[in-house]
Structure formats: C-alpha cells, structure tokens
C-alpha cells in the first residue's frame, strides 16, 4: 500500500517476580489490537517486550526459594511467554533485561552520559539493615508516617494521607527483610543530571507525543522542579555493575526501558533487521510505548532525557492507560478477583476478555472496570447472539440447499455499500485507540445485519419451492455481511477470525473488505464460539481464592507508583441525610451528546447539545479543564438532572445539569451508564 509506515511498538516490561494477571493483560491486549490493526492495514510493525528482571525483590525472593536469581527469572519468563501466547499477543520478540544485549547497550549509554558530564556523584545517607548487611530501598522499610502518624507505611509515601517523604523521616522504622531496626550509613551514589534537559522536555511535552493528562501532570512536575535522578544501588543487588566502580549497580529503572532497545536488538540480530534505522536520532520510523499510568514519570521524564543525552531518537508517542478494577473495586486476593492469567485460561476463552476490554477501552487514562455480570452478558449478547448467530442462521441453508455455494450477485447492494463505507470510520477509531467506539459502530452494523435477516425471514422463504433463488440470495447476503463484520473485528478476535476464514475459504484483509464473495464455495459450518457461562466465572473466582489462601502471608514490597489511584484520597464527608421523598424530586435522565464544543469566551464552560429521546436540550457545564477535546464527547451518554429549572447564564441558556465526579478542575469525570441505555431513560 502507499504511505507504508514502519513502526516499533512496545509494552511495559512485566516484573519477573510474579505471575501475569488480568491487570497486565489490559495493556498487552490494548497494544496487540493496535498492532494487529496496523498490520491489517499493510504497515510494517515490530512488536517487542521483555521481562524486567533486576532488583532487590528478585534477589530476595530467589534466596528465599533457595535458587539463583537467574533460575527465578528464567521460570518467570517461560510462564509469562506462555500466558501471552495463550491470549494471542502477537509479539515478534519477548526477551529479558538480564541479557547481553541489555548489558552492552546500558553500559554504552551510561558511558556516553558520563563522558558528556551528565552523571554526577555525591554521598548520601541511607538506611542499612545491620542483620542482612544491605542498604534498604524505600519499599523495604516500613514505619509510622511522619505527617499523619499512620502506622505500617512504606519508606517513600503514605497510603493514608498520600504524603511523600524520605525513608529517613519515618518514625520507628523497621526492615521489611529482617524486621531489624535500620541504622544510617553513608554511600556514594551516581545521579543522572535530569534538570539539564528541562527545556527539551518542556518542548517535547507539547509536541503531541503525550496524552493531555500526561502533559498536564508533567507541567506539575516542572513547577515542582526537576531533581537529579539516583541511578545507582549498592551491593548486594541483582543487576548490572556500573563500569569502573566497586559494589555499585545500575538501578533497575535505568536498564528497564533500555530493555525495549535490547529486545529489538535481539530480534534484529536474529532476523537481519536494521537496528539503527529505528533508533538513530533522525529516524523516519515510528516508536510507540504502551504503559500503565503508574510509570508515566519514568517514561515521560527520565527516558526521553536519557535518549536525548545519548543522541538517540525519542518516542513518537506514549500511550498510557488506567488500572483494572473488578466489580467496581480494586482487584482482591481475598475476594478472588486478583485473577492470574493462567487461572483465567483454565476456564474461559481468552477472546472473551479481549472483546470485553476492547468494548471499554478508549484513548483516555481511565480505570477499566471488569464487571463480571456484564462480562458474561456482553460476550454472549454481542459475539454469540449477534455475530456468530448471523453466520450460523444463514450457513445452514447455504450448505444444505446450495452445496455451500454463494450467490453470484448481492441481494442488497445499498446495504453492502453502507457496511463497506464504515471501514474508514472504524479504522480511525482503531488508530486513535478508541476501541469502544469501533466496537459500538460494529455492533450497530451487526444489529442491522440481523434485522435484514429477520425482515427477509429465510426460514419462511425456505418452505416455498418457488422462492429458491430468493433464499439463495438472502442467505448469501447474510454471509457477506458476516464477512465484513468479522473483518472489522479481526484485530480484537484473531482466533475467531481464523475460524471464520476457514469457513469462508478466504483471508480477511482490510484491503478486500469491499470485495464481495460472489459465486464462491464456503466450508460446512462448524461452531465458531461457545457461550460464556456464569459458572465459569465462579470457578475462576474460587480457584483464585484457593490459590492465595494456600500461600504464606509475607510482606511483599510494592513497586512505587507516581500516579497511584489506589491510595486513599481526601474524600469529602457525606452530606446531611435526606428522605426518599427529597430524592424523588430529582429527575435524572440518560442523555446522548449530539454536539459538545468549548465556549470561547469562558475558561470553564463547555456547551452540550443533548438528545433526551423525545426532545433536545442545551446545557452549559463547567468541565472544560477536564475535557480539553470536547468534540471527543460527541456520541457519549451522560447523566443529567432533567428537572432543574433553566438558568440564563452570560453565555446562553442552560437547561439542566450534567453529573460528574471528582474534586473539581481537571479532576472531573463524567458519569455514564452500562451498555443498553438509551436517551431519555430515567435513572432510578
């Protein structure tokens, strides 16, 4: 195809100290859908990842198990690869940060930075475990928060009041490793001169390489002042030694992102690809990182600064996503919702999760809720009842009455053209990572396809001998519409698409969507997808509970997060109690956004044109800071107070109030509803 693009796509590196869970899978599914879509469009895409295999937790866990760190990370890598393959994640290479490629690139980049005067040294004071004879990283110290006096808090931040501090400030600290009271020791550490890159980073922040929410967060960091970054750790430590030093190692977060380069270098060495073409400073290729919101700090500040300092190219874009919650709350081991990928795979088709995540994913940094009841309902409703049923209800007639041969012309050319015409819109949604919009549009088409079959009623036509040609045309048309739909869904449901290709006897490509299957044989129809049963979910939950109930309860230091939504927030107190009669006075309605635009003269207001089913309303809402691209709200459902008296404002009439949650300003989130809601529905 013309304008063929060359891309390198990465996912954040899973830590080699634990199993893959459904939180990890959100990112890898999101990236894989995007990669598969780009490949369908004819672009050249390389998709790589690796295990993040260094750090104190791995060293200690290996010692606890009586094995070497190398043995521990080898097993983790094999397990991770097996899980990703089972979920149909189409990596071209999956490597490890504990590799010769990573050692060589990390060492070379460090020496470049050092020789440019970008590595500084100074003596710092640290907590030291006198029993284990080791310096203690922040998360290996616990004590009482110096700000709010909450007990049992980690050495870098308080999960009660959200304060950050030095582990030296903890009250009554103790070592998570041994329980001993740490002492203070001094050590020379090595620092990357991040402030030297502030001007470059400010320019890069506004270059379009970051989501607006990340750019806003970076502005806060700039205002707070950039600090030199400690890139060293003291022995004992599992990682790469720093050249020309004794008992000093690179901090895991220095060599972890370099793992992207190392994994690609490994692929290049095996396949003959040109490594420099993708990483040289003036590269014409594209580089994309899919990451979680908790590691934005490292990827948006340290990583581009390191690349700039080493005369390497910077990412084309960084795509961050939120966390996974289950039934509205944080994943829980005790409730059985901290589900490992391997547990899920024993009981449920991986494509069920791929579809559900896709149906909810958008380009914003929002947490995604895996509602287990909705999961079952949506998979069965969309994939089984709508999509697969469309094929099966027509295929039986084609096989039995027409020897598997499709008609030689389209029964409804206008309907075919309507389906094909949506290819560009669906492609735009995939490109923008607005998978929820793509799925919504595809399912709208699926409803139209099933309505076509319902209206034509081939089961009635089949009973009339003189309508054989009509039966052939109608059922062939139904199969043709199914072909278009499954083509659109191929990036999301690759295994279902493969089974559909075997049935249709053709390859599903983006460039042949507009080419109908005329006078072509299809294979005898076989079941394409099985219904998802609630009992399968129940088995996953129970097995997860059992898995963690048998594991010893030991303290596991957590990876620090710079954008941690799981910390307890400053929640506003509950308002004064009201009666049910008071609540009944509110008429809350579902509304669909017809058009949303900024009010140019206002710093706060967006103007909404809303569909309430039987009429339209205009509402002015002060959420401009939270939604910098108001046009992206078009088509969304919102909840509004419909019986609020109209209010004449400076910028126009506001006929109601749209509901949102948050503390105000940029921290506001529109409320919406579940699948199936329609404009005008009353909220009860």
Swiss-Prot record:
Record-listed Zn(2+) binding positions: 145, 148, 158, 161
Annotated GO biological process: methionyl-tRNA aminoacylation
GO CC field: cytosol
Residues covered by the tRNA-binding domain: 582-684
Motif extent ('HIGH' region): 14-24
Record keywords, A-Z: Aminoacyl-tRNA synthetase, ATP-binding, Cytoplasm, Ligase, Metal-binding, Nucleotide-binding, Protein biosynthesis, RNA-binding, tRNA-binding, Zinc
Catalytic activity of the protein: tRNA(Met) + L-methionine + ATP = L-methionyl-tRNA(Met) + AMP + diphosphate
Motif ('KMSKS' region): 330-334
Enzyme class: ligase
Required co-factors: Zn(2+)
Keyword Mitochondrion tagged: no
Residue sites binding ATP per the record: 333
A matching Pfam family: tRNA_bind
Family to which this protein belongs: Belongs to the class-I aminoacyl-tRNA synthetase family. MetG type 1 subfamily.
Quaternary state and interactors: Homodimer.
UniProt protein name: Methionine--tRNA ligase
Organism encoding this protein: Haemophilus ducreyi (strain 35000HP / ATCC 700724)
